Amino acid sequence: VNAEIDVLREMGVEFKCGVKVGKDITLDELRAQGYKGFYLAIGAQKSAPIGVPGEELEGVFGGIDFLREVNLGGKPAIGTKCAVIGGGNVAMDVCRTAVRCGAEDTYIIYRRSQAEMPADEEEISEAMAEGVKFRFLSAPVEIIGKDGKVSALKVERMELGEPDEKGRRKPVGTDRKSVV
């Protein structure tokens, strides 16, 4: 990320972090200072649920929420085994952060193949280098709990069907399920 920021700085981009537009400064004030273009990077505000039974169990975290808690100095109780659902850059950030927080076995569970992953190749390679294991063509169907806490994850084996509107082959369930 720092290398990407440096490239932008070299291009003349000026960063103003921690500024509340509308409170600390207004767009009109910035215009008066000669600025002509603005990019407001507010970030993702909330994790999206995956929509399977068991999401309410203790030990289930949304990716954005998990990263926010860690960035604020928190230590989420993730245990020694961690499954991260998804194949994007946030999922890569979450799995690598989980490893750094002490998870000994960290898995990416992704419903398509590696070729269809939206994450940057560099992010995937770095996650692999940090010991993250990948389980492709798997989709979560249930988060299993014991005494109100996560104990396992039930996944369904997927196959790739016809391409979707973005050109990625659509995952299709096979009814073959296993517990990981």
Annotate each PLM feature.
Residues 50-54:
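Conserved catalytic-core motifs of eukaryotic protein kinase domains, centered on the activation segment
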Residues 78-88:
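Beta1/beta-strand and adjacent pyrophosphate-binding region of the FAD-binding site
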Residues 56-58:
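Flexible, Lys/Arg-rich cytosolic regulatory linkers and terminal tails that connect or flank
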Residues 2-49, 61-78, 100-180:
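A Rossmann-like FAD-binding core segment of flavoenzymes
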Residues 91:
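N-terminal Rossmann-fold NAD(P) dinucleotide-binding loop
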